[in-house]
């Protein structure tokens, strides 16, 4: 059966040779007409709650730990367990039913919140970091599981998940400020409120999400027939014409994964051996994992190592204090992420390396400015930071959209979960790079007579 982006439920980039506005509107209308609203709502909530807890626990843990522990240690406690979970779990988690997984993740999330909240305000750093670790385990396991779950519910579920994860950054950053500042609950009270949030995932999975697609689950990675596929459904990369991917301006030629999956195909039993999954993961590295890893290394190095030093004289900015720069950069970044992670129903990017390399260019540009101070206005930096968020969100959601579209159905569930290790791996690498770069860049700026980064600490 021949499939292309034009028939997969994903839209080409407007203005490309294979698209017209009339055709584009027709496809868009068809996509939403065939989308189950309950699926969209459930996956949007999955993405929101799974990621908002990550943001909320990190913010609260930093406040509770105070100055006794470097921020980098808290960051690594929040990222490393998630990375290790995504690295290991795809090879055995397929034996655990989704209902059991979600129950465990909800319990871990609640426990993480409660452990951090119950720890004494002074000291008990190890206990607080334990709470962060529990929340990180839940976040990592949740991401790879919910991405795998989109295999059963189609492209609409993936778009909703991506939008929810993008919204989590904005909502999470604002929620902690509202709870601690506006409402005045304090750190502990805010965490206790946060411990209730995982119940939303319970409602979404058992109360909102249609369970029909999961009724045939047999305790392994499952193949789901494509809409309109014939019973004998001989699907694979061999059946996709070489020009099928050309429906978007950024589309590459035949997928790099095509040959790999042709050679490493394990059959259509729906269950895969450990070594079969290892071969699948190797086939995913260059077409999907590497561009996602690159974009995360670049953007989180910017966020953690470079952005804190992108400071201008206050009379040349809209701010009254130097410490106001970084939160606003974070807001612009999260806004860009939310927009681009919500964009796959409208715009698709097929060549994942292009935005990844553009993100690396952003890192180089902003690092050079931190050293040489050549960008004349902070408003230009605002544009670059917003662009950074757009690129990062676009690579994330389009990576999984490409897997959904190009990887054979019998390999897709594993591939969606296994590829998620790249984002946590990129954050871990960037965490180490960022700690070193922030210190070095600040020292360099002070030596050049620009001591703005030191004034943040004094604020």
UniProtKB/Swiss-Prot annotation:
Topology in membrane: Multi-pass membrane protein
Swiss-Prot/TrEMBL keywords: Amino-acid transport, Membrane, Transmembrane, Transmembrane helix, Transport, Vacuole
Major place of residence: membrane
PANTHER family: BATTENIN
Segments crossing the lipid bilayer: 37-57, 73-93, 102-122, 129-149, 167-187, 189-209, 240-260, 283-303, 325-342, 352-372, 374-394
One GO cellular component term: vacuolar membrane
Cross-referenced InterPro entries: Battenin_disease_Cln3 (IPR003492), Battenin_disease_Cln3_subgr (IPR018460), MFS_trans_sf (IPR036259)
Protein name: Protein BTN1
Compartment(s) where it occurs, according to its Swiss-Prot or TrEMBL record: Vacuole membrane
Gene Ontology BP terms: L-arginine transmembrane transport; lysine transport; regulation of intracellular pH
UniProt cross-references to SUPFAM superfamilies, sorted A to Z: MFS general substrate transporter
Signal peptide residue numbers: none
Role summary: Involved in vacuolar transport and vacuole pH homeostasis. Also required for cytokinesis.
Family classification: Belongs to the battenin family.
């Amino acid at each position: 059966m021949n499939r292309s982006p034009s028939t997969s439920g994903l839209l080409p980039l407007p203005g490309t040779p294979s698209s017209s506005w009339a055709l584009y509107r027709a496809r868009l209308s068809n996509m939403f007409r065939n989308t189950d609203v309950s699926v969209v709502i459930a996956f949007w909530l999955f993405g929101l709650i799974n990621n908002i807890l990550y943001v909320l626990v990190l913010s609260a843990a930093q406040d509770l730990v105070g100055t006794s522990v470097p921020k980098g240690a808290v960051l690594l406690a929040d990222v490393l367990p998630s990375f290790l979970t995504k690295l290991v779990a795809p090879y055995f988690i397929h034996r655990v039913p989704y209902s059991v997984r979600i129950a465990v993740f909800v319990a871990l999330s609640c426990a993480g919140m409660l452990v951090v909240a119950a720890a004494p305000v002074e000291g008990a750093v190890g206990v607080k970091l334990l709470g962060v670790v529990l929340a990180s385990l839940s976040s990592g396991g949740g991401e790879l599981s919910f991405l795998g779950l989109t295999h059963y519910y189609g492209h609409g579920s993936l778009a909703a998940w991506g939008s929810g994860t993008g919204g989590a950054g904005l909502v999470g950053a604002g929620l902690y400020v509202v709870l601690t500042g506006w409402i005045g609950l304090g750190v502990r009270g805010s965490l206790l409120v946060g411990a209730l949030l995982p119940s939303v995932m319970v409602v979404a999975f058992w109360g909102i999400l249609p369970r029909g697609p999961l009724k045939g689950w047999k305790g392994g990675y499952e193949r789901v027939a494509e809409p309109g596929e014939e019973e004998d459904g001989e699907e694979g990369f061999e059946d996709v014409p070489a020009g099928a991917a050309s429906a978007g301006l950024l589309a590459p030629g035949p997928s790099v994964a095509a040959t790999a999956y042709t050679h490493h195909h394990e059959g259509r039993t729906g269950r895969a051996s450990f070594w079969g999954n290892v071969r699948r993961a190797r086939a995913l590295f260059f077409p999907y994992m590497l561009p996602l890893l690159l974009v995360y290394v670049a953007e989180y190095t910017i966020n953690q190592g470079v952005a804190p030093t992108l400071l201008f004289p206050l009379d040349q900015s809209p701010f009254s204090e130097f410490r106001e720069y970084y939160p606003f950069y974070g807001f612009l970044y999260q806004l860009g992420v939310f927009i681009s992670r919500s964009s796959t129903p409208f715009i698709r990017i097929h060549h994942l390396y292009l935005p990844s390399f553009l993100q690396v260019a952003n890192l180089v540009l902003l690092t050079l400015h931190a050293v040489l101070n050549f960008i004349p206005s902070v408003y230009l930096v605002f544009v670059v930071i917003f662009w950074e968020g757009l690129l990062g969100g676009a690579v994330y959601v389009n990576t999984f959209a490409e897997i959904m579209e190009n990887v054979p159905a019998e390999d897709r569930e594993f591939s969606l979960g296994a590829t998620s290790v790249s984002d946590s791996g990129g954050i871990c690498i960037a965490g180490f790079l960022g700690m070193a770069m922030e210190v070095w860049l600040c020292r360099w700026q002070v030596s050049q007579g620009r001591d703005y980064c030191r004034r943040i600490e004094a604020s």
